[in-house]
């Protein structure tokens, strides 16, 4: 993929925020949304830690905290949060050139170059945790395993030095595909949740799609009708396009 790559999430987020403010958006940082205000099947706004905010349209896009907000409305889409570990491995000064960007379905890890000769490796999607209480560090056992696994793809990584790591959260749905839709039965309520670790790269398109949905328009960019909130209740989960083959 000659046009593939990666971006710094902090810089991109700040860039989005700054441009949004120029376009008239108000961003309220550190003000927790505690509940969605509903009356007679219609959205009235949200309750926050500093008071109510009134609006006839609300998009729940709270990542790991989306499930709790939906559950308070009696909505359960099977959303879970899982812990994902990230390791930084330094290959040393003698190594020349960057390694490839890898997504290894068989061994269950992804990797990309970082600063200098450091490789960033992400792994683990099985440990279900709460969004506020989980181990934000990494596991020694997983470090040993992942260093052995990635050495099968990039020789020499077994000698790399562990220089840091952390754990974050994926928000996942039962079929590991996002929900992008309005909520039937509650006028003015919309959801954009469950990106399984892909939300950062998909966010520009998600913003366009959700804008179309809120305006009652068919998206001109991509058909997201299969990502509706009712697909689980109706027995229409999405199928994964990830696949692997073994050559014997």
List each language-model region with its residue ranges.
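Mid-domain beta-loop-alpha active-site segment that forms a flexible
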Residues: 1-19, 63-65, 106, 142-149, ...
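Helical element adjacent to the flavin cofactor pocket in flavoenzyme catalytic cores
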Residues: 1-57
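Active-site catalytic microenvironments for nucleophilic, acid-base chemistry
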Residues: 19, 23, 72, 209, ...
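Short, surface-exposed charged micro-motifs
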Residues: 35-37, 54, 101, 110, ...
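Central helical "cap/lid" subdomain
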Residues: 48-98, 221
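Active-site lid/adjacent beta-loop-alpha segment flanking the redox-cofactor pocket in flavoenzymes
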Residues: 78, 91-189
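C-terminal catalytic lobe of FAD-dependent flavoproteins
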Residues: 148-248
């Amino acid at each position: 993929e000659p046009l593939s790559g990666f971006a710094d999430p902090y810089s991109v987020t700040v860039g989005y925020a700054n441009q949004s403010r120029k376009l008239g958006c108000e961003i309220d940082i550190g003000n927790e949304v505690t509940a969605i205000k509903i009356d007679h099947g219609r959205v009235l706004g949200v309750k926050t830690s500093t008071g109510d905010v009134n609006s006839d349209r609300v998009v729940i896009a709270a990542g790991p905290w989306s499930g709790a907000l939906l559950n308070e409305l009696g909505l359960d889409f099977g959303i879970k949060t899982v812990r994902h570990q990230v390791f930084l491995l330094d290959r040393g000064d003698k190594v020349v050139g960057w390694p490839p960007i890898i997504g290894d379905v068989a061994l269950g890890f992804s990797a990309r170059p970082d600063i200098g000769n450091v490789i960033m490796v992400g792994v683990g999607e099985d440990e279900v945790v709460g969004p506020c209480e989980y181990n934000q560090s990494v596991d020694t056992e997983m470090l040993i395993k992942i260093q052995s696994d990635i050495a099968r793809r990039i020789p020499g990584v077994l000698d790399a030095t562990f220089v840091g790591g952390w754990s974050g959260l994926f928000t996942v749905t039962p079929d590991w595909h996002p929900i992008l839709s309005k909520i039937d039965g509650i006028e003015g309520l919309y959801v954009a949740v469950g990106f399984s670790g892909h939300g950062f790269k998909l966010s520009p398109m998600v913003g366009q799609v959700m804008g179309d949905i809120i305006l009652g328009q068919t998206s001109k960019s991509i058909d997201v009708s299969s990502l509706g909130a009712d697909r689980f209740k109706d027995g229409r989960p999405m199928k994964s396009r990830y696949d692997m083959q073994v050559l014997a």
